[in-house]
Amino acid sequence: MGDFREWAAYGSSAVARGYRAPTLAAAMAQSLSHPVAIRRDSLRAAERRAADIVARVRPTDDSESKRKSVVAYVQKLIGVSLGSEVFPFGSVPLKTYLPDGDIDLTAFGSAAPDSTLISDVRCILEYEEQNSDAEFEVKDVQYINAEVRLVKCLIDNIIVDISFNQMGGLCTLCFLELVDRHIGKDHLFKRSIILIKAWCYYESRILGAHHGLISTYALETLVLYIFNLFHKTMDGPLAVLYRFLEYFSNFDWDNYCISLYGPVAIASLPDIVIEDTDIRSADLLLSQEFVKRSIKKFSLPLTESEKSSAKFCPKYLNIIDPLRENNNLGRSVSKG
């Protein structure tokens, strides 16, 4: 694997000789081993094994039916009682959830400071928890007073997170669905997300924003970055996982953010100055025009409170939201 320190040493000697040192982005893009360097028969066998793993953890007809029933149940409960609409977002409608994956819902209603929407939803679910005739078993209802306020519970032993007036989650869902269709290859983007999520959740234990770990959308953005740069050399989920691990295990997270088009020096913030990757724009998967259209279609106008804090705030892990560049998708990660 390439080592960032080797490139830094090269840069220092190059400057001494009068040459321009490569940017981090260019160094990273050039230093990765090419998957085809592995014997083709070995690579095909490994991809078949990876496909077996994806088949074991991907959504099934039974899991789809179960989750659809739970979503419909919550929609009916809240809709009949409060007249509020409830929509699923995240991994369930994207069909990239793991067997242990939760259901993300958002309920729409009054956003006024004196609104009782959140407490009303909590009361409805607490009533169902005591209702022996309820359609599904409801347990462990709790209110989470976090940056995004939630009512969390177990319904039929599936974790359900209900947020409120979260249009951003629906916009992100639409954007990722559009990207998957753009990539094609029998939903290679979604299959790769499933494999990489499985590795992050079951093997490395780094997935889970509520536990100070990386969020699902942040992970999906990192996967999308790998597709954007290396899509021409990737035809299976294992090749994507290989590129993902190779690239980000050597990334200089202490000094750089990651954006869809390359690293951004933390020292340059609040200005978003993307380093040159030495990859021609024509060779990238997503053109600037594609992203601009997506932002126009799926981004929301900033609220007054968001306008007052509209600068990207560096944390321990820094990932720039493709749809809103002042939003740090790595902000959930705490230092271990």
Predicted region positions:
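Acidic, Ser/Thr-rich intrinsically disordered and amphipathic helical segments
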Residues: 45-49, 69-73, 116-120, 150, ...
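Pol beta-like nucleotidyltransferase catalytic core
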Residues: 29-30, 39, 225-336
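Short amphipathic alpha-helical segments embedded in low-complexity Lys/Glu-rich regions
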Residues: 86-96, 139-150, 210-218, 236-245, ...
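N-terminal regions immediately upstream of nucleotidyltransferase
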Residues: 1-100, 113-119, 136, 141-143, ...
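Conserved catalytic core of two-metal-ion nucleotidyltransferases
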Residues: 122-170, 191, 201
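Basic, alpha-helical interaction scaffolds
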Residues: 174-216
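P-loop NTPase catalytic cores that bind/hydrolyze ATP
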Residues: 214-228
